[in-house]
């Protein structure tokens, strides 16, 4: 059972991607998130992708702005200044969530939203998000493997 209530709406068709973490050492390559966005857009015709960013994600936001995906009609780049506004937007539209080991992944998982989380420099056995729909991936050499 999700800690913050099961707020997942499987009818939503928006993939949320949070490619930052506040620490470059924890971030999987931005190309991984671009690939996840393209796969979702190609597979789900009426879908959209939101790339979300926090105050510590300026360098990753720059990569997103430079990406050809930023001009795609079904892709939005969003920044959030408060956790409350982020949570409300997430609950309103997220079908699933993809990100690094970060606070936003923990929040999504505790809301019951299916969450794929990538670990690079921290231990997922200690820091894995809690929730019924969490998949953990290790990104330790450019090749991803699921735990």
List each language-model region with its residue ranges.
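Mid-sequence helix-capping/hinge segment at a functional interface
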Residues: 1-26, 30
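A short acidic, often aromatic-flanked loop/helix-cap motif at beta-alpha or helix-coil junctions
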Residues: 4-6, 82-88, 140-147
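Pocket-edge structural micro-motifs
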Residues: 19, 53, 138-139
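Short, charged/polar "capping" segments at the starts of alpha-helices
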Residues: 25-26, 55-63, 124-127, 146
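Donor-binding and catalytic core of enzymes assembling or modifying cell-surface/extracellular glycoconjugates
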Residues: 32-121
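Nucleotide-sugar donor-binding patch of glycosyltransferase catalytic domains
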Residues: 106-147
